[in-house]
Amino acid sequence: MRETKEQPIWYGKVFSSNWVEARGGVANVVDPSNGDILGITGVANGEDVDAAVNAAKRAQKEWAAIPFSERAAIVRKAAEKLKEREYEFADWNVRECGAIRPKGLWEAGIAYEQMHQAAGLASLPNGTLFPSAVPGRMNLCQRVPVGVVGVIAPWNFPLFLAMRSVAPALALGNAVILKPDLQTAVTGGALIAEIFSDAGMPDGVLHVLPGGADVGESMVANSGINMISFTGSTQVGRLIGEKCGRMLKKVALELGGNNVHIVLPDADLEGAVSCAAWGTFLHQGQVCMAAGRHLVHRDVAQQYAEKLALRAKNLVVGDPNSDQVHLGPLINEKQVVRVHALVESAQRAGAQVLAGGTYQDRYYQATVIMDVKPEMEVFKSEIFGPVAPITVFDSIEEAIELANCSEYGLAASIHTRALATGLDIAKRLNTGMVHINDQPINCEPHVPFGGMGASGSGGRFGGPASIEEFTQSQWISMVEKPANYPF
């Protein structure tokens, strides 16, 4: 961390070409594991958004006009700056986000990979020639930058889920205004500003404005922002989509999930349970792709539940500043109350808690619940906590029906030794991503990522899909001589 003798460069500030005083005041940066104050971040307001938009609009035209190789070089250099500081990024992820250290290092690594992949997008072919029914006419469709992109990023994977929009948007010639969540304003904001600034990003091209919902609302409402890329809850995503629709503003929404982990009777049970534990309890279940519904065939359900409960009981929950824990804290007290209410509601409705179901402060034990029915809230809700609800099915048709009864459609996993059967089931799921003999928390930066239904607006991040998201199509036609029209 670059510091003066007293404090880091970002202390109490926001990044808008340079580090400047925030018009919205300041907020504490808090460690969710113990409540310690780690620092102070600036808090933006609507005036900061307006100033950033004006600067971004001016800078974007020049940024888009420079050779693609120069834009790509800056993004790659920023990636190398991240690599140099990966342990610092990981440390902040632990202290700010409640992550265990391996999660922090993984996130720094995949963000680094994402940045290099995004830099490569700038050099991909940028246009398609189409034939014409008009003699002598040439039709060219090319991709051009959207303009100014507003990125509203979440707290759970603050670095990666910001970077998957920021890096490709910049590489493709856009200016970016990033609003990180206040709960992770350093990992998902200040440090990102530092690495791009150190890499030589021109003034005005990138702005980082930590803030609350009011800042997001100002970004959505500002006509100078041409696109909003939002990752977060479906509830908030619906509001953003509605407002962007009224303004005819491009929007990319990556929203919630209530993902299924389907286990057929022929599955490798140990493998299915191993995948289930990772896919449910990673980062305390605070992952949009986490396995939120375990659909298990009756023939193996009891064995599966017992094996998963045993794994859950062996997971150590505690302060992530120690390397000896598997699960850290939930992000805030509100989330603890919400998770526990879902567990208690399931118990009252007849479900059986085989492991966990208890908490102390923000630390929630890995929990396994048996006999969960589709009408229970724990089945219908995105839990965002370390809870594995198990629902029994008797046939493949029933499993597919149970999987598809949710409004969400983000990710799924299927366990079977018959790959053809797994593929057939995958094709019938209303789900954007399906992983056979794995778990649903999967992401590779070069592969299109996104969901169906209430899990998003239908767009995708990753590889060539990012070009579709962060550019727009322009048709140019040419003829050597003007046509002689009848009037």
Curated annotation (Swiss-Prot):
InterPro entries: Ald_DH/histidinol_DH (IPR016161), Ald_DH_C (IPR016163), Ald_DH_CS_CYS (IPR016160), Ald_DH_CS_GLU (IPR029510), Ald_DH_N (IPR016162), Aldehyde_DH_dom (IPR015590). NAD(+) binds at residues 232-237. GO terms for biological process: catabolic process. Pfam families: Aldedh. It catalyses: benzaldehyde + NAD(+) + H2O = benzoate + NADH + 2 H(+). The active site is at 254, 288. Keywords: Aromatic hydrocarbons catabolism, NAD, Oxidoreductase, Plasmid. It is an enzyme of class 1 (oxidoreductase). Optimum pH is 9.0. One of its GO terms (molecular function) is benzaldehyde dehydrogenase (NAD+) activity. This is Benzaldehyde dehydrogenase [NAD(+)]. It comes from Pseudomonas putida (Arthrobacter siderocapsulatus). The gene is xylC.
